[in-house]
């Protein structure tokens, strides 16, 4: 029914700071990037490779900084390179593997979500239609690259239609 996809999308507007019913408490909101879609595509590609011998499409590496201790980012703080999905290419937040400097010992595994301000979102997406156009184009590009499956693309696009309501609620 798409409810889970809508919850994943909504998490970018208010990512949780705890997981597993509060067993693990972190100092900052955890990375709300839905890795499920990329994982499903990777597993499908792995299965196909085993069955046919045809390797999956290769994905670009994250772009390291000169000292190789971090990653190059765009003007919004989003990492350059790596597997691209609409959650990365049409960001509502900076989804990062870094950033937990406190909380439970496992928090370092969860990364962080830094939600954009209303002003940042307005500059990136002047209208909801502008956001949806960019989101749908990025979703189609992710399918074309093999990063996500076509069946997941439908749900990802449907969840994004809630952008305006979620923006208003945040």
For each feature predicted by the language model, list its residue ranges.
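C-terminal His-loop and adjacent cap/lid subdomain of alpha/beta-hydrolase
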Residues: 1-170
């Amino acid at each position: 029914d798409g409810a889970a996809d809508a919850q994943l999308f909504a998490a970018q507007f208010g990512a949780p700071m705890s997981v597993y019913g509060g067993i693990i408490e972190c100092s900052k909101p955890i990375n709300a990037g839905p890795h499920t879609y990329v994982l499903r595509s990777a597993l499908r590609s792995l299965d196909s490779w085993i069955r046919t011998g045809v390797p999956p499409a290769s994905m670009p590496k994250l772009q390291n900084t000169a000292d190789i201790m971090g990653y190059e980012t765009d003007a919004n703080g989003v990492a350059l390179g790596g597997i691209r999905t609409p959650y990365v290419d049409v960001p509502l937040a900076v989804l990062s593997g870094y950033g937990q400097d406190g909380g439970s010992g496992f928090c370092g595994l969860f990364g962080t979500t830094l939600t954009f301000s209303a002003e940042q979102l307005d500059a990136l997406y002047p209208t909801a239609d502008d956001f949806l156009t960019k989101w749908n184009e990025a979703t189609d590009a992710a399918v074309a690259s093999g990063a996500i499956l076509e069946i997941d693309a439908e749900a990802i696009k449907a969840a994004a239609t809630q952008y305006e309501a979620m923006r208003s609620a945040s």
